[in-house]
Amino acid sequence: ATFFDPQPRLLAD
């Protein structure tokens, strides 16, 4: 995910 991804769960991707 990107830094501004609306879904925080994707930040761990």
Swiss-Prot record:
GO cellular component: extracellular region
Cysteine pairs bridged by disulfides in the record: none
Compartments where located: Secreted
Keywords annotated in UniProt: Glycoprotein, Immunoglobulin domain, Secreted
The keyword Amino-acid biosynthesis appears for this protein: no
Modified how: Glycosylated.
Tissues expressed in: Plasma.
Organism for this UniProt entry: Oryctolagus cuniculus
Glycoprotein recorded as keyword: yes
Protein name according to UniProt: Alpha-1B-glycoprotein
Lineage: Eukaryota, Metazoa, Chordata, Craniata, Vertebrata
Domain of life, per lineage: Eukaryota
Subunit structure: Interacts with CRISP3.
